[in-house]
């Protein structure tokens, strides 16, 4: 079972003034550019953030920085050799940089994104080696302005995974940013408060080998052309 005390504290937070606020309030639009730049700097430095999506709060890092990805894998107890990893992209053109997208899949994604879906596609060699162990990558383009704006400003994908959760836990520790910060604040570099989050995961759609399969029905209902 996940124990938030087991992973080491974030190296980026060590030595900082305790008064330095690690819970940052953001809004759908008109955010302070300095606040956004602070997030980008953390990600570029290999740091981890917790942030809202159109489904649930997630842990994220720079999607091309392997050490940061490894930190998230340790926190989530993910074996990248056995589990698909997912990234958030800003738009469809950036998706095609990191995943192989044929015409049919492109039309399907264009019809359903942004939205609460994870599309499983074959990855390209632009992804770090840790992704290429399984040759597939989950693609997210959430209908959430905060997460997409971060991806746009970062000019790179965000490696993303939902928060660790145990069945007996109060759901507020998955949805309330202040409680999320209380539980996970010591093992990430910043928690972004985007309001109360959801509890329903994304719908996972596998689009490899010329087949389409709903692997997990979640919040999104897929509309085919």
At which residue positions do the language-model features occur?
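Glycine-biased, low-complexity coil/linker segments
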Residues: 13-15
């Amino acid at each position: 079972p996940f124990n938030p005390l087991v992973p080491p504290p974030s190296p980026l937070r060590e030595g900082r003034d305790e008064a330095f606020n690690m819970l940052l309030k953001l809004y759908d639009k008109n955010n302070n550019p300095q606040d956004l730049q602070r997030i980008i700097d953390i990600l570029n430095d290999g740091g981890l953030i917790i942030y809202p999506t159109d489904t649930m709060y997630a842990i994220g890092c720079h999607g091309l920085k392997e050490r940061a990805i490894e930190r998230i894998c340790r926190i989530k107890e993910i074996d990248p050799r056995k589990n698909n990893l997912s990234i958030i992209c800003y738009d469809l053109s950036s998706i095609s940089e990191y995943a192989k997208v044929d015409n049919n899949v492109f039309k399907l994604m264009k019809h359903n994104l942004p939205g609460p879906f994870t599309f499983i596609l074959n990855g390209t060699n632009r992804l770090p080696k840790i992704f290429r162990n399984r040759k597939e990558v989950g693609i997210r383009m959430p209908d959430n302005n905060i997460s997409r704006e971060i991806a746009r400003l970062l000019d790179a994908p965000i490696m993303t995974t939902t928060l660790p959760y145990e069945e007996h836990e109060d759901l507020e520790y998955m949805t309330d940013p202040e409680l999320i910060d209380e539980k996970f604040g010591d093992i990430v570099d910043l928690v972004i408060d985007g309001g109360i989050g959801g509890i329903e995961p994304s719908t996972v759609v596998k689009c490899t080998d010329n087949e389409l399969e709903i692997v997990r029905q979640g919040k999104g209902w897929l509309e085919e052309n």
